[in-house]
Amino acid sequence: MTDPVQNPYISPESIAEDAPGGSLSEFVRPGQIITFALVQGVLVITAILFLFIKGEAAAANPAAPNAPTAGGGDLVLPGIGIVAAVGACVIAFALRTMLRRTSINKYRKTETKPQEIASQDASLTPAMRQLMKNSQVGTLIGQVILEGAAVMNAILMVVDDNIIHLVPIAILVAGIVIQLPTVGKKRQLAKTATDDR
């Protein structure tokens, strides 16, 4: 009776490390929700800032229609936005590829009996669960890098009042969506990890 009540969610005894559990769908669904939230965030921020600059232009003083805006006619800020977008794409996909390769190598070192995943609800081994967690983290990092560059372009759009920033924003949003986790992609990852051992 002297044992305190323990929260099963934080108790180390609640889940044995070597017990099978989890499924592909448990790793896919949260990633899809996060992807939707990231895309929605970028689109909402961009729409609000776009409406802000359009509203500002409509309320401008009609006596001075040719008054220069901050950075108006200048290509420095659009150039910065495009370079940031290209850099973010390169970093996001290179980092994701590196993390994927590292996760697969770690899986191959720790898993003694490779697991074939029959269905999306099949129970995963601890090593396969860790592979899926690492894959989830790599995808999220890549998506967040792209989101940051997209928000930066939205802010630059307000600073220089130039809608050319919508082009890199659209490309970056497409990059976020391309990384959307699916059961097929996770099964392919598992197949790649178990093949060519």
Outline where the language-model segments fall.
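Low-complexity, intrinsically disordered extramembrane tails and loops of integral membrane proteins
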Residues: 1-24, 117-121, 194-197
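Alpha-helical transmembrane segments
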Residues: 72-90
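Short membrane-interface loop/juxtamembrane segments of multi-pass integral membrane proteins
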Residues: 111-145
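Select subsegments of transmembrane alpha-helices in polytopic membrane proteins
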Residues: 32-41, 136-146
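Hydrophobic, membrane-inserted alpha-helices
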Residues: 146-156, 171-173
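Alpha-helical transmembrane segments and their immediate juxtamembrane interface regions
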Residues: 161-197
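Membrane-water interface of transmembrane alpha-helices
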Residues: 90-115
